[in-house]
Regions:
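Short, glycine-/polar-rich solvent-exposed loops and beta-turns at beta-strand/coil boundaries
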Residues: 92-94
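Generic secondary-structure signature for well-ordered alpha-helical cores
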Residues: 16, 54, 83, 105, ...
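Ribokinase/PfkB-type carbohydrate-kinase core domain
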Residues: 1-14, 60, 75-90, 101-214, ...
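Glycine-rich phosphate/adenosyl-contacting loop at the front of the ribokinase-like
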Residues: 1-64, 71-72, 224, 289-290
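Conserved phosphate-binding/catalytic region of the ribokinase-like
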Residues: 2-8, 189-290
């Protein structure tokens, strides 16, 4: 593995997560009492940027918050985690994005996202360098993601969540797409993508080149406390591992281990070790079909 981790620029959402933890998730029309309420920083983009920084990478966040107390709280959390927030816009007249989340005793969740400022920012004045790895998600406007793809001269990664139809131009630009198994099924065009990583929860993860499975790694055993943010930690770890020249099976195994630590943490932005510690911890993983 390369000893120097790459610079990762995340273009994505910044949310305040309002989380109600309860024994079970309500059914339609049902009210459940006895919940425990907490608020914490979140948003797929912010979660991925924080994970990249905590793993030892150089992380820059591009996104937006509202000119409100919640926005200031999100900026402080990002900066405190070591993320460069110079390109996070503070938008007058927009509320900071908010996610309303219910979590059950097994760590499963239901989420409603109110995008706020995430739906209103642009890349005006933002520049990307050739050595930057750019990581996007789909919780911000698709035009912003497309513009980032066009303007980024370096390695470009898309976490295609939430799932939606992807323009051919965007898919062709992606050096790597990361999805879970449900998203992989909902976006048929991914079978033609040059490189796709798919997570399967307890089934581990796999890598596909043009629809052909070329590598896989088993999941790490873990007791789930909260699945929010686990996929984001996986994304950050996989990007860093691949850009540090780890082969596909080992990069997947390292990302699985990071995701397992995240699942065991109650926070959407969990405490993580440095990437090299996960590399040392994880045994080799096999090539699919061998």
């Amino acid at each position: 593995m390369s000893t120097r981790l790459p610079a990762v620029t995340v273009v994505g959402s910044i949310n305040l997560d309002i989380i109600a933890t309860t024994d079970r998730l309500p059914t339609a029309g049902e009210t459940i009492g006895g919940g425990v309420l907490q608020q914490q920083p979140g948003g797929k983009g912010a979660n991925q940027a924080v994970a990249a920084a905590r793993l030892g990478g150089s992380a820059r966040m591009i996104g937006a918050v509202g000119d409100d107390a919640q926005g200031r709280q999100m900026l402080e959390a990002l900066s405190g985690a070591g993320v460069d927030t110079a390109d996070v816009a503070v938008l007058d007249g927009e509320a900071t994005g908010t996610a309303l989340i219910a979590v059950d005793r097994d760590g499963e969740n239901q989420i409603v996202v109110c995008p706020g400022a995430n739906a209103a920012f642009s890349l005006e004045g933002v520049e990307f360098g050739p050595d930057e790895t750019v990581l996007c998600q789909l919780e911000v406007g698709l035009p912003v993601v497309l513009e980032a793809a066009r303007r980024s001269p370096g390695f470009f990664v898309l976490n295609a969540a939430p799932a939606m139809d992807l323009p051919a131009e965007l898919l062709e630009r992606c050096d790597l797409v990361i999805v879970n198994e449900t998203e992989y099924e909902l976006i048929p065009a991914l079978t033609h993508a040059k490189l796709v990583a798919v997570t399967y929860g307890k089934g581990g993860s796999a890598m596909f080149e043009h629809g052909r499975r070329v590598a896989e790694a088993p999941a790490a055993a873990v007791t789930a406390a909260n699945t929010i943010g686990a996929g984001d930690a996986f994304c950050a770890a996989l990007v860093l591992a691949l850009r540090a020249n780890l082969p596909y099976p080992r990069a997947l195994a390292v990302a699985n281990a990071v995701g397992a630590d995240a699942v065991g943490d109650l926070s959407s932005q969990p405490a993580l070790a440095r990437l090299e510690e996960y590399v040392a911890r994880v045994p080799g993983a096999g090539i699919a079909g061998q």
